[in-house]
Amino acid sequence: MASQQIAAGSVSEGAAPVVFDGEHLDIAAVRRVAEGGAACSVSPQSLAKAAKSRAVFEDVVNAGIPVYGVTTGYGEMIYMLVDPSNETTLQTNLVRSHSAGVGPLFPEDEARAIVAARLNALSKGYSAVRPEILERLALFLNLGLTPAIPEIGSLGASGDLAPLAHIASTVIGEGYFLSGGRPVPADRVLREHGLEPLVLKFKEGLALINGTSGMTGLGALVLGRGWEQVRQAEIVSALLVEAVRGSMGPFQPEGHDLARPHPGQIDTAANLRALLRGSELTVEHADLRKQVAAAKQAGTSVQRTEIYLQKAYSLRAMPQVLGGVRDTLAHATARVQTELNSANDNPLFFEDQEVFHGANFHGQPVAFVMDFTTIALTQLGVLAERQLNRVLNRHLSYGLPEFLVAGDPGLSSGYAGAQYPATALIAENRTIGPASTQSVPSNGDNQDIVSMGLIAARNARRVLRNNQYILAVEYLAAASAVDVSDRYRGLSPAGKATYDAVRSLVPRLDSDRYMGDDIETVAAALGRGEFIAAVENCNIDLR
């Protein structure tokens, strides 16, 4: 998906404000912050709760009670006792030593999503950070000051230590912010905005970096965009059904609502019915049966006809395939939204309770569902590529010319070449194995089972991006299938809107031309949600 850049020094007036309270952050709100530059604030209740948690925590420390990461070393070095007089040095050293991420930087929208996820986890009020820490992260988001976060370095337990350390570095005036996609020293950026670096107190370095906010913030964006991608797949599937004069029968409500009531299947079937409503090209199954009966010759025991009562799976199993994707996304969304509103560092502090030394930083729940999302999105891409092949292969396309060539086949190749990147990307998607079972012990075997959750989220993002190109080729081919069959006039309102949206971007393929630009153009439009908007402008409310 296309990444978004937020201008420094300004807050978007178009996106609804987001209040961080540790309880109600959802994927839509993360996207408003990450992509839309929504104004951010921490609720007064969360600030008060943070202050109370801090007071409880300081009472514990002042009573001489040992606390991990406050009066001890970190990780495997927990056996080392550290005098409280070293509070700032201990926290600062942790941030510096763990700012060890490598590789490409997260784009600005993804980095903002990660900051938002960390802010909300701390806003839960059990992490014992001062309210000033929460307010500083919210200020960064409002000013468009986005930490430069390398993508590689997290094991997913103890949370996303390395990525989050790069955020914490900017809080203390070290590390880098992004400017135009490039890193700029944080101390310089803070001076330009009249901000002083914060001095970390007991536990604050640990609280900032010890959590699942990398995988959760990125996962929230992937899931939000994944929901859009499944709708985009439904839209182009409907257009292809029209182009090959498919049947409405497989999408009738009884077969889904009554017979097999998986929520995703029901929703995809409903969307296909809405998208095909008003089409003069689709046929009813009852009419097909009549055609078969009329074609039967008396006295023949076996007879070949050109009438297909059912078309191939790729043209009638969309409710089952894309509905399965929907159900996967729904499960993953529920788990990620729970994690967005969780205190996922260690230790945690509760009024009148024992200090909780645990492992809420472990990203296994998120890692599992991001792997599940990768599987589901991979199958979405497979369906799209098989539908594409169906209209390009003259033996399978129900009368359409080979490779949708508008002129002379052989002299012209049509979409023969454009199919290759789609097929290659399917193969690439299939090479991505589960990350959530790839635990490798680290940290002196203290971290002896880890989740690799951020790798799982990055894998899902990779498939999402690959699918954008697969769908782009399918949208182009679907529009050309309408052209070569001269079926535009019979399209449904949604079909015409989809076709028109494609043709507003690229002209008809009447002769071979340089194809890469067409694919990139349509892929970018998919990233902007233009085809969903075109359909919704026809008063179609997609589920």
Predicted features by range, described:
Residues 2-38, 42-49, 53-61, 83, ...:
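C-terminal auxiliary extensions adjacent to catalytic cores
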